[in-house]
């Protein structure tokens, strides 16, 4: 619905019923089921223990993850290893085909850290962040990472880490 609204300047008709909601936008009709019940207070599930914070260009981070992910296939799965230093994030991926390495500049505060992620989940979160820069908040090598806008609270994406083997 949001994508249709972005491309439309016409009126939107909204028709709620007991179990469904209907949106009419230009020549499109979208019908959705309404959910009912108690939902998890997601804010209480978000990690609050932040030991490391990385502020980085969203586009640069996406491109770097894509580059090191070139060796990953459905058959050759391997995590993207992120080594967060003083002012750089080094990304690695090692498969039986070889090793890919990239390094990007970032604004980093807190502890240095090494953590691994599934490349697809990491890319999904970064691509959904429609801001020029993101803040990555990390609590440790086995704690979830929060992806937030540089300023404000327009979104919060949680990316779970992958346990890394010791070799690098």
PLM regions and their residue ranges:
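DNA polymerase processivity clamps
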Residues: 1-35, 50-168
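Short hinge/gating elements
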Residues: 45-49
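Specificity-determining recognition surfaces
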Residues: 41-42
């Amino acid at each position: 619905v949001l994508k249709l609204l972005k491309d439309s300047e016409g009126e939107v008709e909204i028709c709620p019923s007991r179990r469904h909601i209907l949106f009419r936008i230009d020549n499109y009709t979208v019908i959705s089921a309404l959910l009912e019940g108690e939902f998890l207070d997601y804010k209480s599930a978000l990690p609050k223990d932040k030991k490391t914070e990385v502020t980085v260009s969203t586009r640069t981070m996406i491109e770097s993850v894509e580059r090191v992910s070139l060796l990953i296939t459905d058959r050759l799965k391997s995590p993207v290893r992120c080594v967060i230093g003083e002012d750089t994030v080094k990304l690695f991926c090692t498969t039986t085909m070889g090793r890919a390495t990239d390094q990007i500049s970032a604004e980093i505060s807190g502890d240095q850290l090494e953590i691994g992620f599934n490349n697809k989940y990491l890319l999904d979160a970064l691509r959904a962040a429609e801001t020029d820069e993101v803040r990555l908040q990390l609590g440790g090598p086995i704690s979830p990472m929060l992806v937030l806008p540089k300023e404000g609270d327009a979104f919060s994406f949680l990316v779970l880490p992958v346990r890394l083997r010791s070799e690098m």
